[in-house]
């Protein structure tokens, strides 16, 4: 089947990735954008672009609007990317009803794997091990009772969707009610459904996932595994293919479990079957946690070690081609290592707290060279928005040799070459992860980043391997400068002094005028107010939640710095 056009129902780096893959197959591509996202680079990379009604993520989640855009632009296929509508069975059904091919799994598979409780039941039926848990949406009372049975800790998860949103661990019974409410709120905002379920929490586990692809003729194969144990608050930050230091016999058992599960469901398109490997004991027990019925953010590392273009493969399978047509009847053998580091626009506090960084990029120069790939959408002058995810780019490095330490060093060096100015990014944080002995020795687990976040959030100490604008601009401080001509290093000393002066940026906090003797508490970020949890006259304690603000798809709690009485609430 040849598509007349492919509409990409997404934005940013993944929309660009899909557009290029489709264009290389000779397909016409159409981008969509919300009214406040017209300046995003994906609108220029695609052959055409159509504006959606509405602002922010809501526009990209409007099924009728996306279908109408496809019909108006003459597209008979839609690629959803990841996030947004990618895992909504309702959207796949709407595409079918409109005579448009949904490039992804069937609506039935989306419905099954989009309901994490049903997916657990299906895993058990396929003889795939799962964590102890409750296979349905639970109430707060049920979650509290489950915690009572497992006081070592439980994890609350959104019943729909993934990406770490609506997912939090509970290790203290006193925190359960607040965390439960936060998970429900995040799940509702991200997926439109507030339902959550619970499982036993594994504090020392590796996250291993298997890449599956199935065609419409009943054939299914795998493309190896990835390790995604480097996570901050259940969100992946660094991914690896293949998983280093994984016992070969264990690797094969996990892959066989994923393939068996996919075959039991006659799975079609790309899919990722995810497992936790318990490292607290023998390190040989694994459990299924979820299947993501879509293209993954980290598909890139699998591409680099197998040489298979997963996006093109997904499009071709949707067009009716078989795995044999794609030369994928037999699993591809990985070569070397690939590492992906997610570069986010954010500011990290000394305590590891994270705030999204919004504003204008004044410089954007990604690294390059052999074995260095960057999937991003930044450019000089791009103005970001808190309405969307903070991911700016993915730096992917690959090596041909089976030397994981060398791959780590290469990834760290590539990040020092990434010039991002005007906004804060997490490159130092990523460099610290990649250079840490635990990471290089492949001995980390899913809580490792959170346990070491204060160390990882500190400046990396690595030298930036790029020239900033200030180093070469006219009037940079040399003209008319007085230096000691007898000192051969005087110019360098003067240059360093001028750069230090430029870097001294004064941050102006919001000024809140309140009653005499009161101290204002302001939101440290721009965003949408989710809730105000204090009223005039309330007595509050230090650390007590006062409000919740949502920005870049994550909720941030604003807490009191000290005990006091609320005298005024302003918005």
Task: List the predicted regions and their residue ranges.
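N-terminal beta-alpha lobe that positions the nucleotide/phosphoryl donor
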Residues: 1-273, 277-296
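Short amphipathic alpha-helical segments
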Residues: 4, 165-166, 242, 389-395, ...
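A basic, amphipathic helix-loop patch mediating RNA/tRNA/ribosome contacts
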Residues: 8, 22, 403-414, 543, ...
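Conserved beta-strand residues within beta-sheet cores
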Residues: 30, 153, 195, 207-209, ...
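Short, flexible turn/loop "capping" segments at secondary-structure junctions
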Residues: 158-161, 234-235, 385-391, 522
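A short, polar/charged loop-to-alpha-helix boundary motif
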Residues: 230-237, 297-305, 422, 553
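Catalytic cores of soluble metabolic enzymes centered on carboxylation/carboxyl-transfer
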Residues: 258, 300-515
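Structured functional modules or segments
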Residues: 513-571
């Amino acid at each position: 089947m040849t598509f007349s056009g492919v509409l990409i129902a997404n934005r940013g780096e993944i929309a660009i990735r899909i557009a290029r893959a489709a264009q290389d197959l000779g397909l016409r591509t159409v981008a969509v954008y919300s009214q406040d996202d017209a300046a995003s680079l994906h609108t220029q990379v695609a052959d055409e672009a159509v504006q959606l009604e509405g602002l922010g993520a809501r526009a990209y989640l409007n099924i009728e609007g996306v279908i109408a855009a496809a019909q108006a632009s003459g597209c008979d296929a839609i690629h959803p990317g990841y996030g947004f509508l990618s895992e909504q069975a309702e959207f796949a059904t709407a595409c079918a009803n409109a005579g448009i091919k949904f490039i992804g799994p069937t609506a039935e598979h989306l419905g099954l794997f989009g309901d994490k409780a049903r997916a657990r039941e299906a895993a058990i039926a396929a003889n795939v091990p799962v964590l102890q848990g409750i296979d349905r949406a639970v109430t707060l009372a049920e979650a509290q009772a489950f915690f009572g049975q497992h006081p070592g800790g439980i994890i609350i998860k959104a019943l729909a969707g993934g990406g770490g949103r609506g997912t939090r661990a509970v290790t203290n019974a006193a925190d359960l009610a607040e965390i439960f409410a936060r998970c429900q709120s995040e799940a509702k905002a991200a997926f439109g459904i507030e339902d959550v379920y619970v499982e036993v929490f594994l504090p020392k586990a590796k996250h291993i996932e298997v890449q599956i692809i199935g065609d419409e003729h009943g054939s299914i194969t795998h493309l190896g595994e990835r390790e995604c144990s480097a996570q901050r608050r259940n969100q992946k930050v660094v991914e690896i293919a293949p998983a280093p230091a994984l016992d070969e016999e264990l690797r094969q058992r996990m892959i066989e479990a994923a393939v068996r599960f996919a075959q039991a469901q006659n799975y079609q398109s790309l899919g990722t079957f995810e497992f936790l490997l318990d490292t607290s004991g023998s390190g040989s027990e694994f459990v299924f946690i979820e299947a993501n019925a879509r293209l993954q953010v980290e598909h890139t590392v699998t591409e680099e070690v197998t040489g298979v273009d997963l996006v093109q493969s997904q499009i071709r399978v949707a067009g009716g081609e078989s795995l044999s047509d794609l030369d994928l009847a037999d699993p591809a053998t990985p070569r070397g290592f690939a590492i992906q580091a997610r570069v986010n626009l954010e500011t990290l506090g000394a305590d590891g707290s994270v705030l999204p960084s919004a504003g204008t990029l004044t410089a954007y120069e990604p690294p390059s060279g052999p074995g260095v790939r960057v999937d991003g959408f930044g450019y000089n002058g791009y103005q970001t928005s808190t309405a969307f995810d903070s991911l700016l780019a993915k730096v992917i490095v690959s090596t041909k040799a089976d030397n994981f330490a060398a791959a780590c060093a290469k990834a760290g060096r590539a990040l020092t070459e990434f010039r991002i100015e005007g906004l804060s990014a997490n490159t130092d944080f990523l460099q610290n992860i990649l250079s840490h002995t635990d990471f290089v020795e492949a001995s980390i687990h899913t809580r490792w980043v959170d346990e070491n976040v204060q160390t990882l959030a500190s400046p990396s100490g690595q030298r930036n391997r790029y020239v900033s604008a200030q180093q070469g601009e006219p009037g940079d401080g040399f003209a008319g400068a007085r230096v000691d001509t007898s000192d051969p290093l005087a110019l360098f000393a003067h240059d360093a002094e001028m750069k230090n002066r430029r870097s001294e940026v004064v941050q102006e906090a919001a000024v809140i005028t309140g009653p005499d003797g009161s101290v204002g508490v302001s939101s440290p970020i721009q965003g949408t107010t989710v809730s105000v949890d204090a009223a005039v006259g309330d007595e509050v304690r230090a650390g007590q939640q006062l409000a919740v603000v949502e920005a870049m798809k994550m909720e941030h709690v604003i807490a009191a710095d000290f005990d006091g009485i609320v005298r005024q609430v302003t918005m």
